[in-house]
Amino acid sequence: MVDVNKFESMRIGIASPQKIRYWSFGEVKKPETINYRTQKPEREGLFDERIFGPQKDWECACGKLKGVFYKNQVCELCGVQVTTAKSRRERMGHIELAAPISHIWYFKGIPSRMGLALDMSPRALEEVIYFASYVVIDPKETDLEKKQLLTEREYREQLLKNGFGSFVAKMGAEAIQDLLNDVDIDKEVAELKEELKTVTGQRRVKIIRRLDVLSAFRKSGNALSWMVLNVLPVIPPDLRPMVQLDGGRFATSDLNDLYRRVINRNNRLKRLMELNAPNIIVQNEKRMLQEAVDTLIDNGRRGRPITGAGNRPLKSLSHMLKGKQGRFRQNLLGKRVDYSGRSVIAVGPTLKMYQCGVPREMAIELFKPFVMAQLVKKELAANIRAAKRKVERQDSDVWDVLETVVKEHPVLLNRAPTLHRLGIQAFEPVLIDGKAIRLHPLACEAYNADFDGDQMAIHLPLSEEAQAEARLLMLAAEHILNPKDGKPVVTPSQDMVLGNYYLTMEEKGREGEGMIFATPEEVEIAMRNGYVHLHTRIGIATKSLNKPWTENQQDKILVTTVGKVIFNSIIPEGMPYLNEPTDVNLTTSTDDRFFMDAGQNIKEVLAGIDTVRPFKKGYLGNIIAEVFKRYRTTATSEYLDRLKDLGYYQSTLAGLTVGIADIPVVEDKHEIIDAAHKRVEQITKQFRRGLITDDERYNAVTGVWRDAKESLEKRLIEEQDLTNPIVMMMDSGARGNISNFSQLAGMRGLMAAPNGKIMELPIISNFREGLSVLEMFFSTHGARKGMTDTALKTADSGYLTRRLVDVAQDVIIREDDCGTDRGLVIADIATGKEMVEPLFERLVGRYTRKSVLHPETGEMIIGDDTLISEDIARKIIEAGVKEVTIRSVFTCKTPHGVCKHCYGINLATGDAVEVGEAVGTIAAQSIGEPGTQLTMRTFHTGGVASSSDITQGLPRVQEIFEARNPKGEAIITEVTGTVESIVEDGATRTREITVKGKTDTRSYTVGMADVLMVEEGEFIHRGAPLIQGSIEPKHLLQVRDALSVETYLLGEVQKTYRSQGVEIGDKHIEVMVRQMLRKVRIMDNGSIDVLPGTLMDISDFEALNETALLNGEMPATGRPVLMGITKASLETNSFLSAASFQETTRVLTDAAIRGKEDHLLGLKENVIIGKIIPAGTGMFRYRNIEPLADLTNAPEVKEVETETVEN
């Protein structure tokens, strides 16, 4: 066997008849499979042991030669070679076809490769191949033309006219094979290239397509005639198995039926030809054979598919590769693995961040070989077999050994669907009783897990290297930050938030208010003995608290609460004392207003300070981010565990409960409702009088009810009591939001009808009062629509992620610095007055391309090619800089990847990105994972606000990445210049905008309802939109350059995600958008050997041009092409990756003709062939490490004799 990790590349081609015979171990002559009495394979049949190898290891068919001793010997009696039964998965057979047969992939594919090679239409080909017409192969002296089609009648007439043998015309694939053999590729290519110089239009397109196919055959060394089969390969029998079911019946793979049809028809044809049967019978048999082979290769490609029992189409060879259940996606890209298990998850509140609970029963099975080895080593079992029996009996000493084996051996936990890389993390197992896996509560957010019956899979890394990687790179305690935005992904939720919120609350006048303590210990004693409450405001000596005070805060008394003293006791030393939820308090120091001198009256001080709001969920997230920034992972995960324990403990003590009486009643609700009813009546009257249109009436009515609901909500917020448990849950961010609260206490408001339109009748009741039957019925529409939308959205979002991963999977950090001199100018992204993404967020963690100077003083804030930290970014913003030129993925010159400087920091670690990081896959996951949070709907405004429906949410993201023509397209100007005039035309309800440039003037017609983006006299650059809407990126690319398009797409994706409250780092979108513009279409090939119209990678194009210029030749010219992600995935250089994505047969047909070579640069192609992926620690530069010193001639080291001392 070839060592899979050694070979460099993989090539695919068309098999010649000689090659097929060389692969084969014998000819299959009979359609028989297995003898039903003896259960042995029939001779010369589809399962023959002589051809395909023995059914039992090291044993021939008759049983004469048994055992490894006879390895590779051939039995004289039965003729079977003694070898392993596994050879039945490798040895092929063949069928000698009685007539040539066309291969359906090359004849039927689009475009038909056979048709292009012969310059015949696919219809003509079909008529010839399926025996409907003759084709003239050699007209000799007659007035016929070569490749002319003749019907049966015309053929006979020509024979009568010209005499027998005066010309050669044939039918069937045989005729096509003769024609293909006649083609002189070099001559044809030369003629076509000459013709190409003069022709234009459709003819030019056709010539280029023919040239493409012919030169592909010439370069790859495939012969044209190989597209017609004379020999048919038979795949190994274990790949098309036949198994006996209970009750003596057999289940067989469809391929066996298909092969049987081919063999039957082939044998019948041979017999007919031997008998010299009439021509018409032989022709019919040949046609049937052609159809049988077509069905075997690709059932259903031509005509109706052949069906088996129950009208199910049979699965042909092509179907074995295609789709989700095909060979590529089912068996090569995703395999089932050993050393794994799955179980329901339960919460493990006592675990540390890096631990998970594994049930003993599960662990004993997972770690079985390790336990067995240890039992033998400790001499608790004589040999491995005895150890195995011991483990299966579950003897008492097995459990002790298990404890030692499990220690420090990390396991991987995975929850499906794995939407991003945090869906698989490593934990140290802790053995537990029960049958559920215990999961740390803070790991839930990364997995999107809850404990309502979710299941998780557990996997065991086996090798030392795998264990080391799991521990160092995948341990859950290391994954504090989310790769998509660099914010903490482990934020406390629910009970933890509630506990800490309750702990940091303040109340005036609680017992013991104004007491002053010397140390935190005294505070705790006082609280335990009931002198003070958690919420009591007290004083404490600053010097007893180990915190960084400012000079004038030392030796003073800090005014705080009992709970905050406890809360601050778990925060790492060196952090300020947190007394109020503000950023200043978190990053610099506690506010001076909370300090008093030793002699002051504390009651007076307390009277002058308002109560401070408690710490909510968002603030806890900020604290974690700050702790991480200062102390990195280890300290942060320790702090998180303390925070979790404190939160659970305090919420248990607080014992917050919810009863129906906790839902407040708004006193004047009926007044608000009555006012709304009256307003609706007025609007209806106006409509009846014809003062307003139906659309306006509808919008006004829904607006009234929206206002009514909002005023109720406002009343609720104004009157809310912060000690009310429901309000506490909502306010702290533990559970629920204002919308849930107003449905409980205010009114449910307007509902959506099944078609998505808002119904005019609102639900006036709330859940506390209870809904009427009619209201209940109304509200079910919206609820059902919500459920279906979610289900559809999940599928859509998953498919988007799959396409994104496919297009970017080979983008890896390949080098430290590409040395580019280009950069990207960035500023705030904003729509009108609304800020989408501020400059600050875009700067952090990127490298500068030009120095940034202070706009007023001119001093340098940061130099060229330097990493921008948070502090420097803040300085840049404070200096009032509006634009910065940074290194960007868009302008990176690294082929097949990105360099460290153009990418910036790795958001998941906060440090510089490592060479080998698979940034493409991370980018795809970061964009795909929040896809489910985006909305599905295209917003239909009531026909008033704007004329076009603007696509938003998930459909908009797909529209951008697939480079489709957007809905609600904006017209853009093609010239740079001044807006000369905007003229309205009342008759056609349009406006004409004239833009005058330096050289030419253009006019654009827009509708009256379109919202203008320009004014008369305004100076605009080409590519600027004239009206509101989405720009079509392909049009923008024609008008401007690739970088403008990339910048526009980046902004559009950010707008879509940020409008839904999802933050994604720019660099992820940059990686994806760059992949859409990787290709160049050759316009003029210069002196380079490529055809005009060819698509090429930018890096290859530049390299070829460089070579041409150095040799003093004409370089080629090309223009950048914007491709949607699906198209870009299929145009990748790797045929394995493309074939496993979509359109498998088309990709493979094309690759075979071109004799394509896959250099295995990306991740997918390496997974498919089972090679270690070239990313991370599998990167070439980490795998092939050269030793620094040559130690071959080093002096010998003498062995030192040692003795063991037994104690």
UniProtKB/Swiss-Prot annotation:
Keywords: DNA-directed RNA polymerase, Magnesium, Metal-binding, Nucleotidyltransferase, Transcription, Transferase, Zinc
Pfam families reported for this sequence: RNA_pol_Rpb1_1 (PF04997), RNA_pol_Rpb1_2 (PF00623), RNA_pol_Rpb1_3 (PF04983), RNA_pol_Rpb1_4 (PF05000), RNA_pol_Rpb1_5 (PF04998)
Catalysed reactions, semicolon-separated: RNA(n) + a ribonucleoside 5'-triphosphate = RNA(n+1) + diphosphate
Enzyme Commission number: 2.7.7.6
Organism of derivation: Lactococcus lactis subsp. cremoris (strain SK11)
Upper taxonomic lineage: Bacteria, Bacillati, Bacillota, Bacilli, Lactobacillales
Chain sites annotated for binding Zn(2+) 1: 60, 62, 75, 78
Gene3D superfamilies hit by this protein: 1.10.132.30, 1.10.150.390, 1.10.1790.20, 1.10.40.90, 2.40.40.20, 2.40.50.100, RNA polymerase II, clamp domain (4.10.860.120), RNA polymerase Rpb1, domain 3 (1.10.274.100)
Cofactor(s) essential for the protein: Mg(2+); Zn(2+)
Function text: DNA-dependent RNA polymerase catalyzes the transcription of DNA into RNA using the four ribonucleoside triphosphates as substrates.
Record has Nucleotidyltransferase as a keyword: yes
Quaternary structure, from the entry: The RNAP catalytic core consists of 2 alpha, 1 beta, 1 beta' and 1 omega subunit. When a sigma factor is associated with the core the holoenzyme is formed, which can initiate transcription.
Binding site for Zn(2+) 2: 818, 892, 899, 902
One GO biological process term: DNA-templated transcription
Transmembrane residue ranges: none
Cofactor binding note from Swiss-Prot or TrEMBL: Binds 1 Mg(2+) ion per subunit.
Protein name: DNA-directed RNA polymerase subunit beta'
GO molecular function (one): zinc ion binding
Similarity field: Belongs to the RNA polymerase beta' chain family.
Binding sites annotated in the UniProt record for Mg(2+): 450, 452, 454
GO CC entries: DNA-directed RNA polymerase complex
CDD domains: RNAP_beta'_C, RNAP_beta'_N
